[in-house]
Design a protein with these regions (language model features):
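Positively charged n-region of N-terminal signal peptides that target proteins for export
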Residues: 1-4
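Bacterial N-terminal signal peptides
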Residues: 7-16
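Signal peptide processing junction and immediate N-terminal pro/mature segment
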Residues: 15-25
Length: 599
């Protein structure tokens, strides 16, 4: 392991050394390039169709896909069948000469390969035996089918609801297998989280969240058909959905929680050290060891803490750092009195950002998003916010734990120019393969989200020292994750040790701190992706500014990153260095609405 120096240069050099070379940007003969591209396209289109088939989706003659009519099969036999199929795809992918592919197809191949390798990682450790954590689960969001427009789509949704007992039973059987070998979510992160199940156990079907889509149906569906669909939905919710959730609740409380592992560290599970290192690679898409990441985290924590102390001085606060944190956590001026007040602050930040984004990004998405509260069933144990293609969620649960000085950074990250913005641009890349539009890598996506918080400084979003401290507190939060995640899973930190570290370095509330730490404990490796992704993007920008000098323009630089879409960070590094070598000329054509030039 190379020696690590706790300086920004060391952090940069560690990250800079991780990208393997992708084939040189030299076009092969046209015939070879066409043949290799066709072979690659056949592979990823076959995988797309196979993925659709797992949900009963079929491609119609017009090229459109039918709606899903079932949940995927997750039993061990289906999992092994899937792994055999993935290994076969990898063998075929290996047989395609990389040098024969076009520059665009080399990116497609890198993304496709990484997707397949991640599937093999999950298979190697039988990840299906632990299908949830304190943040995400297989039983949530099934009640949100998206926009249903036709009777066929409603019938497909009803069919999926009818399939819920089978789907849950397979997951429960897998979880029993995991319990038997000590592969489970830690018990301490399970306590009190059954509300995400009990909220779906209602006295009537009409009161159930699964029925929400039927309350107001499109007028293009005849009234008689609407009545039939509502009656069928009510019957299925009563006969299939509610009983499935009752079975799940009994299993969760009486079987899973009492038998879940008491050790926190991933290293203490079967083949635990190898498992943790695999999760690090999967979520960061970098070849860094846990120890290297721990040292990067310590370096970043020290750097950010110095900036936080300067910002405290800018605010004119007289007292110690701990006293300043106490002031921020307890003074009423920093907290909303109603959920609507918090939502309005977020919406106001989003609109202010709208007026500035065009100065930094050239191609803007056509799709709009809305800002909504996190659903009540999830809010108590959910993160502060969550960005999505159609909506950006803000958590309004326990308002005394949601300081308003954090909302500007949170809104930029989750809404625009962060997740909702980036996802919309990815969706609008109509010329690329379908699998690219729906691929998500945490290192890229979360790295971009955290980077946009930093862009808020250039955009003039942070108007007070407190809002800037909120930004720094959020950056510190992500840097501390590098220390805590590796501390828990490789070094054996206790939950209390992790809580004390996060609380002592950020202005996060106690509720947020505990929720976050439980997330890191139950979801090894995922939290590392944010800071490592952001460091990669900021380092690439520094390289571009140094190489291009006065010719550097942030708009095409950011357009190039966003037009590329979600890719492994190693691929992003290679691609953006090609962009720099071309003098800042686009390698990928950006799509979207072109923002007017601004000075």
């Amino acid at each position: 392991m190379r020696t690590l120096l706790l300086t920004a240069c060391a952090v940069s050099s560690i990250l800079a050394g991780t990208a393997p070379a992708i084939a040189a940007d030299v076009s092969p003969p046209a015939a070879r390039m066409q043949e290799a591209g066709a072979r690659l396209k056949a592979l990823y289109e076959a995988e797309t169709d196979a993925g659709m088939a797992r949900y009963g989706i079929v491609k119609r003659a017009d090229g459109e896909y039918s709606p899903a009519v079932r949940h995927e099969s997750v039993d061990p036999a289906s999992q092994q069948e899937r792994l055999t199929y993935v290994r076969g795809l990898l063998r075929q992918l290996d047989a395609i000469p990389l040098d024969d592919l076009s520059a665009e197809d080399r990116i497609n191949a890198a993304v496709f390969r990484t997707n397949l390798e991640h599937a093999l990682i999950d298979g190697q450790f039988r990840q299906w035996e632990m299908p949830f954590n304190s943040d995400s689960s297989f039983w949530t969001y099934l009640d949100q089918p998206g926009s249903l427009r036709t009777a066929e789509e409603y019938r497909a949704y009803i069919a999926r609801m009818r399939d819920t007992p089978r789907y849950f039973d397979q997951h429960l059987a897998n979880m029993r297998d995991g319990l038997a070998r000590g592969f489970s979510v830690p018990r301490v992160t399970l306590e009190g989280r059954e509300a995400s199940i009990t909220n779906f156990i209602t006295d009537t079907a009409e009161a159930n969240a699964f029925y929400a889509a039927f309350r107001q149906m499109p007028t293009t569906i005849p009234a008689e058909e609407q009545a039939r669909l509502r009656a069928e939905a009510s019957a299925v919710i009563n006969e299939a959905v509610i009983p499935a959730y009752k079975t799940l609740l009994a299993f969760y409380l009486n079987e899973y929680q009492p038998r879940a592992r008491t050790a926190l560290a991933a290293r203490d599970m079967p083949d635990g050290v190898a498992y943790y290192e695999s999760q690090v690679r999967k979520y960061t898409t970098l070849e860094l060891s846990g120890e290297e990441i721990h040292q990067i985290g310590l370096s970043e924590v020290a750097r950010i803490q110095a900036e936080m102390r300067q910002t405290m001085a800018d605010a004119g606060f007289q007292g110690s750092f701990d006293e300043f944190l106490h002031f921020l956590r307890t003074d009423p001026q920093f907290y909303a009195k109603t959920p609507d007040e918090l939502m309005m602050v977020s919406a106001w930040v989003a609109k202010r950002a709208d007026g500035q984004i065009g100065k930094l990004i050239g191609a803007l998405p056509r799709r709009r998003f809305t800002i909504i509260p996190v659903p009540d069933a999830l809010a108590p144990f959910y993160t502060a916010g969550r960005g999505g293609l159609e909506s950006c969620q803000m958590n309004t649960y326990d308002l005394p734990s949601r300081p308003l000085y954090n909302i500007p950074a949170l809104t930029l990250h989750e809404c625009a120019p962060g997740h909702s913005f980036q996802m919309a641009l990815a969706e609008e890349q109509a010329d690329g393969p379908a699998f690219r539009r729906h691929t998500y890598f945490s290192g890229y996506g979360e790295g971009w989200g955290l980077y946009t918080e930093w862009l808020g400084v250039e955009m003039g979003i942070y108007r007070t020292p407190y809002e800037n401290f909120g930004r720094l507190s959020y950056e510190m939060w992500r840097a501390a994750r590098l220390v805590i995640d590796t501390g828990v899973h490789l070094k054996g930190w206790s939950r209390e040790q992790a809580i004390d570290y996060l609380a002592g370095h950020t202005a996060l509330s106690r509720h947020e701190v505990e929720t976050e730490v439980d997330r890191y404990i139950s979801w090894p490796g995922q939290a590392l992706s944010y800071k490592l992704g952001e460091l990669t993007i900021r380092r690439l920008r520094g390289e571009a500014e140094a190489a291009l000098g006065e010719n550097f323009d942030p708009r095409p630089f950011h357009d190039e990153i966003l037009a590329l879409g979600a890719v492994p960070l190693t691929t992003l590094e290679e691609h953006m260095r090609a962009y720099i070598a071309r003098g800042g000329k686009p390698v990928v054509a950006a799509q979207g609405v072109v923002a007017p030039s601004q000075t």
